[in-house]
Design a protein with these regions (language model features):
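Nuclease catalytic cores that cleave nucleic-acid phosphodiester bonds
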Residues: 3-5, 11-172
């Protein structure tokens, strides 16, 4: 079973105070930071992540699909909102009964629509909480699973050689 996470990009950016501040200066930088956070989350959670950004106000925009370190990044075409794209993708993925779909958005209407399609939802704020919790858990697990072992040279050489080296160390 594949577990998809569809992310309403700008909605999730603006749910994070530090990213919203970055977005005020540079949407490109905010999008990159979001995608980087989602890439790390994908590696730890095993979701297949699709993040969707509105480009519906871009005159003549044809839309695009990019791969950013293992996540699919969608820029919608002119006159297509991220919400519309996410709804259509949710319905398409929901036809495969074996797949699980979660949509990250804080848009109430969007949540109702995707719930009706058979997907689950997570608010943008809750997604940030899950990302941070997953990261902290992985760090703690990694730290605890690899005890630091000292491997002093004394354990690798015979006592006679150790004594010779010790004498050399203190010789003047």
């Amino acid at each position: 079973m594949t577990h998809y996470l569809l992310v309403d990009g700008y909605n999730v950016i603006h749910a994070n105070a530090s990213l919203a501040k970055v977005a005020a200066d540079s949407l490109d930088a905010a999008r990159k930071k979001l995608c980087d956070a989602l890439c790390e989350f994908r590696a730890l959670s095993r979701y297949r992540i699709i993040v969707v950004f509105d480009a519906h106000l871009v005159a003549g925009g044809i839309g695009s699909v990019e791969n950013h370190r293992g996540i699919k990044v969608i820029f919608t075409k002119e006159a297509e909102t991220a919400d519309h794209y996410i709804e259509a993708a949710t319905y398409k993925l929901a036809r495969k009964k074996q797949d699980k779909i979660t949509v990250a958005t804080s848009d109430t209407l969007e949540q109702l629509i995707i719930l009706a399609a058979g997907a689950s939802r997570i608010s943008a704020a809750d997604l940030w909480t899950e990302i941070e919790t997953t990261r902290k858990t992985a760090l703690a697990t990694h730290k605890n699973s690899r005890p630091i072992k000292k491997n002093p040279i004394e354990s690798l050489i015979d006592p006679e050689t150790a004594q010779i080296l010790e004498n050399m160390r203190y010789a003047k």
